[in-house]
Protein backbone atom coordinates (compact mmCIF):
# COMPACT_ATOMS: atom_id res chain seq x y z
CA UNK A 1 0.00 0.00 0.00
CA UNK A 2 1.31 3.42 -0.87
CA UNK A 3 1.41 6.36 1.49
CA UNK A 4 -1.56 8.22 -0.11
CA UNK A 5 -3.86 5.20 0.18
CA UNK A 6 -2.89 4.62 3.79
CA UNK A 7 -3.50 8.29 4.63
CA UNK A 8 -6.90 8.23 2.91
CA UNK A 9 -7.96 5.07 4.77
CA UNK A 10 -6.85 6.62 8.08
CA UNK A 11 -8.81 9.81 7.43
CA UNK A 12 -11.94 7.89 6.41
CA UNK A 13 -11.63 5.74 9.52
CA UNK A 14 -11.55 8.85 11.69
CA UNK A 15 -14.42 10.61 9.87
CA UNK A 16 -16.86 7.70 9.72
CA UNK A 17 -17.76 7.56 13.45
CA UNK A 18 -18.22 11.34 13.49
CA UNK A 19 -20.47 11.21 10.45
CA UNK A 20 -22.52 8.45 12.04
CA UNK A 21 -22.93 10.46 15.23
CA UNK A 22 -23.91 13.54 13.24
CA UNK A 23 -26.51 11.52 11.33
CA UNK A 24 -27.97 10.28 14.61
CA UNK A 25 -28.23 13.81 15.98
CA UNK A 26 -30.14 14.97 12.87
CA UNK A 27 -32.85 12.32 13.36
CA UNK A 28 -36.10 14.18 13.95
CA UNK A 29 -38.03 13.61 17.15
CA UNK A 30 -41.22 11.85 16.05
CA UNK A 31 -43.14 13.18 19.05
CA UNK A 32 -42.81 16.77 17.79
CA UNK A 33 -45.59 16.23 15.25
CA UNK A 34 -48.59 14.09 16.11
CA UNK A 35 -51.20 13.31 13.45
CA UNK A 36 -54.38 11.45 14.32
CA UNK A 37 -57.61 10.64 12.50
CA UNK A 38 -60.89 10.94 14.42
CA UNK A 39 -63.24 8.14 13.23
CA UNK A 40 -61.66 7.72 9.77
CA UNK A 41 -64.29 5.14 8.84
CA UNK A 42 -66.76 8.06 8.67
CA UNK A 43 -64.60 10.30 6.46
CA UNK A 44 -66.28 11.31 3.21
CA UNK A 45 -63.80 9.56 0.94
CA UNK A 46 -62.24 6.93 3.15
CA UNK A 47 -65.57 5.13 3.26
CA UNK A 48 -65.89 5.13 -0.57
CA UNK A 49 -65.93 1.81 -2.37
CA UNK A 50 -62.67 2.24 -4.22
CA UNK A 51 -60.74 2.33 -0.96
CA UNK A 52 -63.17 0.27 1.09
CA UNK A 53 -60.47 -2.17 2.13
CA UNK A 54 -58.66 -1.43 5.35
CA UNK A 55 -55.38 -1.62 3.46
CA UNK A 56 -56.50 1.07 0.99
CA UNK A 57 -57.79 3.33 3.75
CA UNK A 58 -54.65 2.93 5.82
CA UNK A 59 -52.45 3.69 2.81
CA UNK A 60 -54.14 7.03 2.14
CA UNK A 61 -54.16 8.04 5.79
CA UNK A 62 -50.53 6.96 6.23
CA UNK A 63 -49.47 9.02 3.21
CA UNK A 64 -51.22 12.12 4.56
CA UNK A 65 -49.73 11.54 8.02
CA UNK A 66 -46.20 11.07 6.64
CA UNK A 67 -46.53 14.21 4.53
CA UNK A 68 -47.57 16.40 7.47
CA UNK A 69 -44.94 14.93 9.78
CA UNK A 70 -42.11 15.56 7.31
CA UNK A 71 -43.25 19.04 6.19
CA UNK A 72 -44.22 20.39 9.61
CA UNK A 73 -40.87 19.49 11.17
CA UNK A 74 -39.14 21.88 8.80
CA UNK A 75 -41.33 24.75 10.10
CA UNK A 76 -41.09 24.04 13.84
CA UNK A 77 -38.45 25.56 16.10
CA UNK A 78 -36.64 23.54 18.75
CA UNK A 79 -39.00 22.27 21.43
CA UNK A 80 -42.20 23.20 19.60
CA UNK A 81 -44.89 20.57 19.09
CA UNK A 82 -47.76 20.27 16.65
CA UNK A 83 -50.85 18.14 17.14
CA UNK A 84 -53.18 17.63 14.16
CA UNK A 85 -56.46 15.71 14.25
CA UNK A 86 -58.35 15.13 11.01
CA UNK A 87 -62.13 15.02 11.36
CA UNK A 88 -62.96 14.58 7.65
CA UNK A 89 -61.19 14.02 4.36
CA UNK A 90 -62.85 14.56 0.99
CA UNK A 91 -60.32 13.96 -1.78
CA UNK A 92 -60.26 15.84 -5.07
CA UNK A 93 -62.51 14.25 -7.67
CA UNK A 94 -65.40 11.84 -7.38
CA UNK A 95 -66.87 8.72 -8.90
CA UNK A 96 -69.27 8.92 -11.83
CA UNK A 97 -70.96 5.51 -12.04
CA UNK A 98 -73.27 6.81 -14.77
CA UNK A 99 -70.30 6.47 -17.13
CA UNK A 100 -70.68 2.69 -16.97
CA UNK A 101 -69.60 -0.26 -14.89
CA UNK A 102 -65.96 0.03 -15.96
CA UNK A 103 -65.82 3.49 -14.32
CA UNK A 104 -67.19 2.43 -10.91
CA UNK A 105 -63.69 2.46 -9.41
CA UNK A 106 -62.23 5.40 -11.36
CA UNK A 107 -61.99 8.75 -9.62
CA UNK A 108 -62.78 11.56 -12.06
CA UNK A 109 -61.03 14.81 -11.12
CA UNK A 110 -62.91 17.93 -12.22
CA UNK A 111 -63.01 21.43 -10.79
CA UNK A 112 -66.52 20.80 -9.40
CA UNK A 113 -65.15 18.07 -7.10
CA UNK A 114 -62.91 20.14 -4.84
CA UNK A 115 -60.73 18.61 -2.14
CA UNK A 116 -61.80 19.38 1.42
CA UNK A 117 -59.78 18.54 4.53
CA UNK A 118 -61.22 19.30 7.97
CA UNK A 119 -58.84 19.33 10.92
CA UNK A 120 -58.15 20.60 14.42
CA UNK A 121 -54.62 21.63 15.39
CA UNK A 122 -52.58 22.92 18.29
CA UNK A 123 -49.08 24.38 18.09
CA UNK A 124 -47.26 24.63 21.42
CA UNK A 125 -43.96 26.24 22.27
CA UNK A 126 -41.02 24.72 24.10
CA UNK A 127 -42.47 26.15 27.32
CA UNK A 128 -45.77 24.30 26.73
CA UNK A 129 -47.77 27.46 26.01
CA UNK A 130 -50.17 27.41 23.07
CA UNK A 131 -48.86 29.49 20.17
CA UNK A 132 -51.69 28.80 17.73
CA UNK A 133 -54.69 26.49 17.63
CA UNK A 134 -57.97 26.12 15.83
CA UNK A 135 -60.22 24.22 13.49
CA UNK A 136 -59.73 24.53 9.75
CA UNK A 137 -61.68 23.42 6.71
CA UNK A 138 -59.05 23.50 4.00
CA UNK A 139 -60.29 23.84 0.43
CA UNK A 140 -59.10 25.36 -2.80
CA UNK A 141 -61.75 26.21 -5.38
CA UNK A 142 -59.03 26.78 -7.98
CA UNK A 143 -57.13 23.54 -7.26
CA UNK A 144 -57.21 22.53 -10.94
CA UNK A 145 -55.41 25.75 -11.93
CA UNK A 146 -52.38 24.98 -9.75
CA UNK A 147 -49.25 23.29 -10.90
CA UNK A 148 -49.16 20.42 -8.42
CA UNK A 149 -46.05 18.23 -8.37
CA UNK A 150 -45.42 15.48 -8.90
CA UNK A 151 -48.31 15.02 -11.36
CA UNK A 152 -48.26 11.27 -10.74
CA UNK A 153 -49.02 11.70 -7.01
CA UNK A 154 -52.66 10.76 -6.43
CA UNK A 155 -52.81 13.08 -3.38
CA UNK A 156 -51.02 16.04 -5.00
CA UNK A 157 -53.97 18.44 -4.63
CA UNK A 158 -54.49 17.56 -0.98
CA UNK A 159 -50.77 17.88 -0.26
CA UNK A 160 -50.70 21.30 -1.92
CA UNK A 161 -53.54 22.50 0.30
CA UNK A 162 -51.88 21.04 3.40
CA UNK A 163 -48.58 22.67 2.49
CA UNK A 164 -50.32 26.06 2.16
CA UNK A 165 -51.94 25.57 5.56
CA UNK A 166 -48.63 24.61 7.18
CA UNK A 167 -46.96 27.73 5.75
CA UNK A 168 -49.78 30.03 6.92
CA UNK A 169 -50.82 28.60 10.29
CA UNK A 170 -47.66 26.85 11.45
CA UNK A 171 -44.56 28.42 9.90
CA UNK A 172 -45.37 32.06 10.72
CA UNK A 173 -46.60 31.47 14.28
CA UNK A 174 -43.81 28.96 14.92
CA UNK A 175 -41.21 31.64 14.16
CA UNK A 176 -43.01 34.24 16.25
CA UNK A 177 -43.43 31.90 19.23
CA UNK A 178 -39.75 31.34 19.85
Language-model regions, residue ranges each:
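Short secondary-structure boundary motifs at beta->alpha junctions and helix caps
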Residues: 50, 132-164
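Bacterial N-terminal signal peptides
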Residues: 9-17
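N-terminal post-signal-peptidase region of extra-cytosolic proteins
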Residues: 62-70, 101-108
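A structural "domain/chain start" motif
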Residues: 22-62, 80
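Bacterial N-terminal signal peptides that target proteins for export
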Residues: 1-8
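A short, structured loop/turn motif at beta-sheet edges
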Residues: 73-82, 122-132
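Surface-exposed short loop/turn segments
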Residues: 86-125
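C-terminal/domain-edge helix-coil "capping" segments
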Residues: 64, 68, 149-178
Amino acid sequence: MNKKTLTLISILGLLTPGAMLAADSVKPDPARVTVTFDHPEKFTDVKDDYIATEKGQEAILAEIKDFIESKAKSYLRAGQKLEVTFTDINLAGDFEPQRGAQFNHVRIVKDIYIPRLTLDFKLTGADGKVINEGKRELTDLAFMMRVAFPPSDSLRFEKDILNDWLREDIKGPAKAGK
